[in-house]
């Protein structure tokens, strides 16, 4: 009987936005700005690694195919990270609009 009553609270966490409480718009803007920077850094790092592998493919003709595959994977990762940064940029702009609308409604 005790085993049946035992509940794990794995999926019972509430999201702050779902609670209906006040949303901290400044924190939301900062969060999306931070994620945008991470996306940009990821794109730069993956692009640098792709260039590194391109150089390795030229210098090591014996394993050139392996290096070209790694280069292509890094290039795809760079494009994905750039897309993520672009997405977060738009999320940040949306959060700024929400912040401005909330401030406008507050300061009659």
UniProtKB/Swiss-Prot annotation:
Residues 1-34, 84-108 are annotated as: Disordered. Residues 15-24, 95-108 have a biased composition (Basic and acidic residues). Disulfide bonds: none annotated. Residues 25-34 have a biased composition (Basic residues). It holds the Pfam family ABA_WDS. PANTHER family: ABSCISIC STRESS-RIPENING PROTEIN 3, ABSCISIC STRESS-RIPENING PROTEIN 5. Belongs to the abscisic acid and water stress-induced protein family. This is Abscisic stress-ripening protein 3. The gene is ASR3.
